[in-house]
């Protein structure tokens, strides 16, 4: 056979092999002796119809959890500067606590009554800001998330609550910080659970707005079931699916044993990510202070997850470490100097 013919046959064979390789693109091949096996891509898990209606409804109505406004927090200083006719402060603490001292002009509305108050007692959008105040900023963050999801885009949670407003208030933050479990921190990277379905909501509704309405109001009366203490979690961390809602470098420096990192700004409202949160387990969400995790918990509970926010976040179990690494890791450890001395009235 001539060199030209050999070259022609070589080109033809090479082309055929190239075509075969191109046709198999996107599939993983494994050579086993003379046998080539092909692995198909994992089958995508569909979510139930009501969960799909709800997530599509929220995405079409502002997609709050993936907006710049999430989470909607305001610190004491800008809150104080904003006080006036165009700012309404809604204090959600118990009436007997409210009477002992509150921000001037504040109204006292407990969390279960918030939806009715916003719908019937005020015209919310006449205000530039509506600031929710509680004891430590934990419950007000949860309630703010729910109100924001309802479309009230001018609601904010007072960071640190009344504990950060005036030193004479009952300082829940001073009582909530601890370094008790620093020696138990883990640096292992844990993987997310396999994808599965969202929780079944069973509202019987067939439109996204209807599913949302059926789910959102009861959550205002369920906050007591939406929180958990560090002592409880560290006693049996294996009982929970623990979500670390922090930057990767903060996760890597030490986290609750078994905790899995979920990316802030890359989890909520994203079906593939939320599918890895087990529908049949108790979920614990934590961050640095408990504020962000309260927002996340409210959203997850809307979808039927048995989620709980860890009160005071990392401050509740690794406070000393947060202070030591504050500069390098940009932690937010609570200090008594974080509490301002703004006026209160009775």
Predicted regions and their residues:
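Bacterial N-terminal signal peptides
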Residues: 10-20
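Rhodanese-like catalytic fold shared by cysteine-dependent sulfurtransferases
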Residues: 23-73, 99-128, 140-225, 251-282, ...
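Short, compositionally biased "basic patch" segments
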Residues: 38-48, 85-98, 239-251
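Structural motif
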Residues: 88, 129-131, 241, 282
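Short, surface-exposed ligand- or partner-binding patches at beta-edge/loop junctions that are enriched
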Residues: 133, 286
């Amino acid at each position: 056979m001539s060199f030209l013919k050999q070259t022609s046959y070589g080109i033809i064979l090479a082309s055929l092999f190239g075509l075969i390789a191109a046709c198999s693109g996107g599939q993983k091949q494994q050579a086993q002796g003379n046998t080539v096996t092909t692995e198909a891509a994992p089958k995508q898990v569909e979510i139930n119809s009501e969960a799909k209606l709800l997530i599509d409804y929220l995405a079409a109505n502002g997609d709050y959890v993936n907006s710049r406004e999430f989470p909607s927090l305001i610190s004491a200083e800008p809150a104080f500067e904003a006080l006036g006719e165009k700012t309404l402060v809604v204090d959600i603490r118990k009436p007997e606590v409210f009477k002992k001292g509150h921000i001037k002009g504040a109204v006292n509305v407990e969390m279960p009554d918030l939806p009715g108050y916003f719908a019937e007692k005020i015209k919310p959008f006449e205000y530039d800001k509506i600031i929710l105040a509680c004891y430590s900023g934990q419950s007000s963050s949860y309630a703010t998330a729910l109100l924001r999801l309802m479309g009230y885009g001018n609601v904010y949670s007072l960071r640190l609550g009344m504990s950060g407003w005036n030193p004479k208030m009952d300082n829940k933050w001073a009582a909530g910080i601890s370094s008790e479990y620093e020696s138990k921190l883990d640096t292992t990277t844990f993987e997310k659970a396999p994808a599965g379905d969202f929780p079944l909501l069973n509202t019987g509704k067939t439109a996204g707005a209807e599913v949302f309405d059926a789910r959102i109001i009861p959550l205002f009366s369920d906050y007591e079931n939406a929180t958990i203490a560090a002592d409880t979690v560290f006693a049996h961390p294996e009982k929970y699916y623990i979500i670390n809602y922090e930057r990767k470098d903060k996760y890597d420096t030490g986290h609750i044993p078994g905790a899995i990192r979920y990316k802030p700004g890359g989890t909520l409202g994203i079906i593939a990510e939320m599918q890895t949160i087990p529908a049949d387990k108790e979920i614990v969400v934590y961050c640095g202070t408990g504020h962000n995790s309260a927002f996340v918990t409210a959203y997850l509970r809307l979808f039927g997850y048995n989620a709980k926010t860890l009160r005071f976040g990392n401050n509740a179990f690794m406070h000393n470490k947060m202070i030591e690494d504050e500069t390098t890791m940009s932690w937010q450890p609570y200090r008594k100097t974080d509490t301002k001395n703004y006026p209160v009235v009775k």
